[in-house]
């Protein structure tokens, strides 16, 4: 009886080729049906859609190809992202890091789809350029104006980024089958998904700072959920609890941030437009899928690995929701159809009628729903870990908790207060924001020791189960990628070179123009600063540590480079980001070059406070290590003394025994 039951269970855990083939057929038929509906929408709404936006009509081909291509390319990217995450979360790697056979099947899915994704993204560059110029693709290519049309189209440039990232993913998936490779490939895949999400409606008009941040989170969450649904349907097994938790989390994020985007794009929640109706349709589908996932997670816990049916239905539902979003992406949001755009709307998304003061910096808030929300989540997660340790009766230094929470609070303030609001329009305030993100906040976060806390809180996965969060974190800590990035020399080069590369090249002209550029700079400087200070005062395991004198030397070695950077900004006669700052044309700012010189002075002077903080932390750590070493040596000395006495006593007993014989 027991053997039969075990055999039956083992058999049910392996998806049969027939079940996989049926799932693939259902998804293929559903995909063709969804594409047909999207094509019909593009054909029927074509001329009217362009007339409402005041754009020239490029013809029926572009009117149909744009929404269909947008949907197909977005779906391919989502499937690649979901497949990679599925492999990362379900694989049972061999000792050499190679993924197991079950995960390799999903790897092959991502490998095949990535090539299709590349082709679709490259095609969309031409289609999007034709859409924005109002001519057909053949005429555009024949005129030789394709490059100029692409340069003038933000969405076409977004598709170029997506195509480049898809090329990287497609090439790497054919070369690497190790677990770590899939983790690394999440970076270009997410970048590709975000590249097209931040163009179009989210990147223009009033409140586009809110919309861009929301679009980034929504696009990644929605693509992850869609990709995981399709990957799970093709795998033919019930997703693990970790995958299901990820789906529920992504569904909640997509619903929350999607509602925010609809609020920003549809004035008064008016539902009398195609855009609004499509948004509501996507919302209803997404809500239904999310509620079903919540029921499976809370009421009917999953039994990972068991064969099941019904996965294709959720995957098809997410395809339909993505089709609705693709149709919305090629339309102009109702809010912008009658809005009279100003320079504030185009370049900032909000107005700054008065110059910055301390009171305005503290009270002018535009909460960053990406970085600010991340700061809130990190603070809550750390506090929960701290509380969990205390409930177990384990200790954790309160100073680390204070350092981490202070760093998170500073992150929320820097990204959402007047520092960011004025920093997006003034170079001097932007430089204060940059220095805070690069040199002050990372020190506090590193001193919090989040990795050590996580390793103490997260449970060890039992035998026979897929690795969990603790195992993933351990593998990442000891991976070659982490070893390279956290090496003191690598961290030093990144920390020193970053400001020169960003501000003294055309990169800054692009980044400062768009809100996603400000988000990218903030994340980049925060991560680079964290890597550098991790190598110097890090509590967590990971990077190769220099001796304490070497760490102090490394800290002082960066100071001349930052001083020269600040002095260069103070003495330059040309303006960094001149085109953008002239276009914003703040009425109360008399001179943008004088503001740049002030920013250089801020960069030069603000390096001292973080250095003092790091020196204090280093000296404290050094003194504690010396005390530990001295205490250990004292214990060894005491132990040696006791051992000598014991040996003498035993020798005496042996001698007495010999004399008695």
Swiss-Prot record:
Keywords: Cell membrane, Membrane, Transmembrane, Transmembrane helix. It is a multi-pass membrane protein. The keyword Transmembrane applies. The chain crosses the membrane at residues 27-47, 68-88, 116-136, 150-170, 179-199, 214-234, 251-271, 279-299, 313-333, 369-389, 396-416, 435-455, 488-508, 519-539, 552-572, 599-619. One of its GO terms (cellular component) is plasma membrane. Pfam families: Caa3_CtaG (PF09678). InterPro entries: Caa3_assmbl_CtaG-rel. The keyword Ion transport does not apply. It is found in: Cell membrane. Was identified as a high-confidence drug target. To M.leprae ML1998. This is Uncharacterized protein Rv0102.
């Amino acid at each position: 009886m027991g053997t039969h039951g075990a055999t039956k269970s083992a058999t049910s855990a392996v998806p049969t080729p027939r079940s996989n083939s049926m799932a693939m057929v259902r998804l293929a038929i559903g995909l063709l049906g969804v594409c047909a509906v999207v094509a019909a929408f593009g054909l029927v709404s074509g001329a009217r859609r362009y007339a409402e936006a005041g754009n020239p009509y490029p013809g029926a081909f572009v009117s149909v190809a744009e929404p269909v291509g947008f949907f197909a390319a977005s779906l391919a990217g989502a499937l690649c992202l979901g497949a990679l995450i599925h492999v990362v979360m379900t694989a049972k790697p061999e000792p050499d890091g190679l993924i197991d056979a079950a995960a390799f099947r999903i790897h092959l899915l991502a490998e095949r789809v990535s090539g299709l994704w590349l082709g679709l993204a490259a095609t969309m560059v031409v289609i999007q350029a034709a859409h924005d110029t109002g001519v057909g693709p053949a005429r555009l290519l024949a005129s030789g104006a394709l490059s100029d049309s692409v340069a003038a189209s933000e969405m076409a440039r977004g598709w170029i980024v997506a195509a480049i990232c898809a090329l990287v993913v497609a090439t790497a998936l054919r070369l690497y089958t190790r677990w770590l490779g899939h983790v690394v490939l999440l970076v270009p895949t997410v970048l590709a998904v975000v590249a097209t999400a931040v163009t179009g409606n989210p990147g223009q008009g009033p409140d586009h700072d809110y919309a861009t941040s929301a679009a980034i989170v929504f696009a990644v969450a929605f693509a992850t959920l869609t990709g995981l649904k399709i990957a799970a349907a093709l795998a033919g097994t019930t997703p693990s609890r970790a995958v299901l938790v990820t789906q529920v989390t992504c569904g909640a994020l997509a619903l929350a941030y999607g509602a925010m985007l609809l609020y920003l794009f549809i004035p008064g929640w008016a539902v009398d437009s195609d855009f609004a109706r499509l948004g509501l349709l996507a919302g209803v589908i997404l809500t239904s899928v999310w509620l079903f996932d919540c029921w499976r997670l809370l009421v009917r816990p999953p039994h990972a690995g068991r064969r099941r049916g019904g996965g294709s239905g959720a995957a098809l539902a997410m395809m339909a929701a993505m089709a609705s979003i693709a149709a919305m992406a090629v339309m102009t949001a109702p809010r912008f159809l009658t809005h009279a755009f100003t320079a504030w709307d185009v370049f900032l998304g909000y107005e700054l009628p008065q110059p910055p003061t301390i009171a305005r910096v503290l009270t002018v808030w535009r909460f960053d729903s990406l970085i600010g929300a991340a700061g809130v989540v990190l603070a809550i997660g750390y506090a929960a870990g701290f509380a969990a340790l205390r409930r177990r009766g384990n200790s954790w230094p309160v100073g680390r908790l204070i350092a981490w929470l202070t760093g998170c609070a500073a992150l929320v303030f820097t990204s959402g207060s007047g520092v960011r609001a004025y920093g997006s329009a003034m170079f001097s305030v932007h430089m204060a924001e940059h220095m805070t993100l690069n040199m002050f906040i990372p020190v506090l976060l590193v001193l919090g020791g989040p990795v050590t806390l996580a390793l103490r809180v997260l449970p060890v996965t039992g035998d026979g189960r897929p690795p969990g969060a603790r195992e993933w974190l351990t593998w990442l800590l000891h991976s070659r990628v982490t070893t390279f990035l956290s090496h003191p020399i690598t961290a030093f080069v990144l920390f020193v070179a970053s400001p020169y590369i960003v501000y003294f090249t055309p990169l800054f002209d692009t980044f400062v123009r768009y809100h996603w550029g400000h988000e990218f700079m903030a994340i980049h400087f925060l991560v680079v600063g964290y890597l550098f200070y991790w190598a110097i005062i890090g509590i967590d395991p990971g990077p190769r540590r220099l001796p304490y004198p070497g760490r102090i030397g490394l800290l002082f070695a960066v100071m001349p480079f930052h001083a020269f950077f600040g002095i260069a900004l103070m003495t330059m006669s040309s303006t960094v980001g001149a085109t953008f700052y002239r276009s914003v044309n703040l009425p109360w700012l008399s001179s943008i070059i004088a503001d740049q010189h002030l920013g250089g002075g801020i960069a030069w002077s603000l390096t001292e406070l973080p250095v003092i903080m790091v020196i204090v932390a280093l000296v404290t750590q050094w003194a504690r290590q010396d005390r530990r070493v001295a205490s250990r040596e004292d214990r060894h000395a005491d132990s040696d003394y006791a051992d000598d006495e014991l040996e003498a006593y035993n020798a005496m007993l042996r001698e007495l025994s010999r004399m008695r014989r």
